[in-house]
Amino acid sequence: MCFVGIIRFHVHILRIIPGGERFFLLLVLSANAFGAGLDRYSQLVVSDSGANPRNGVRVTYLGTNSYQFEFKNHALLVDPYFSRVDLLSVALGAHIQPNSSRIADSMRHVAPTVDAILVTHGHFDHLLDVPIVMSKTHARLIASRTSIDLAKRAGASSGDAVIAGDVRRIGPWKIRVLAASHDRLFGKVPFDQTASQHSGPPQHAADWVCGEPLAFLIEINGQHIYIDSGGTAAPLPPPVHVDLAIMGMALPDSRARLTAALERLKPRYFLPSHQDDFFLPLSEGFQFGPLTDFPRVQSDCAQENHGRLILLDYFRPWTLPAHQAPNPKIQRPGKRSNSDGK
């Protein structure tokens, strides 16, 4: 087939594919090279060593925008997603379902009992696996009304629907629910509905609609962790100082708001999230997604000088250092103290 014929074929396919899946087919056509891994940025990757104390808040990256936070014998999950549905299945609107084998492999890194699962929005890469993870960990689900509805139709037994401004106290965790937004992909938020058009179980990627995007401010052990999955400059995070800011950086909208978001949060540590190619199995290791731009993120962070930029690799826990205020009796004049530790 000649080049013109290939273009005509692609245009024909785009015309007959429903609008939601069309976003992802465009992504397939635009992703002409695999992203690099973390080797190039090894100096930014943090993890616990055998000698490090683990009595603080431990953070484990589980891929996509999935995280586990642990403190003593308590655990909290955010957006657990391990099935990693392939891109072509999503682009062509094929039936998708949780991958039991991949979920089982990843659950080896998850605490056996989890206090709660927080979900930022209803897309499949945040919510698809949640009903199974709930059943395995006996966790309580905290999410938007739309996400709760989707999860229940997919098999979840219950859920706590929340809106911005709500506060939940679960064990040692204090969770504040914040307003958020979702990035646009090719000018539009994918699957941008607040209620599904179907009443049965979600079958296709387009059935997992966005709903009401949320962010969370988690208070634990005297430390504050902010987490979202990305978004636009409206709304920005609240003007609060946090110890760790985890912000989605998958798409241009998120990167455009980064400077303003860091200025408001003033984090000690900044962890860009949702940067990996979540259509690849976790077993293939971290690869940057085709639409990410980590060099820009790194450059913007250097210019703003708000907190230490870090990266996490899959399943390698890192303990958030305690904030150590400088001791005026010990600090020498003219010397700057380091309050962050390693």
Model-derived features: where do they sit?
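Bacterial N-terminal signal peptides
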Residues: 20-32
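Pre-active-site segment of Zn-dependent metallo-hydrolases
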Residues: 45-50, 73-119, 123, 131-132, ...
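Active-site-proximal loop/helix segments of hydrolase catalytic cores
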Residues: 198-264
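Short, basic, low-complexity termini and linkers enriched in Ser/Thr/Gly/Pro
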Residues: 8, 13-18, 325-342
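Binuclear metal-ion centers of metallo-dependent hydrolases, dominated by the metallo-beta-lactamase
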Residues: 140, 152-167, 263, 268-330
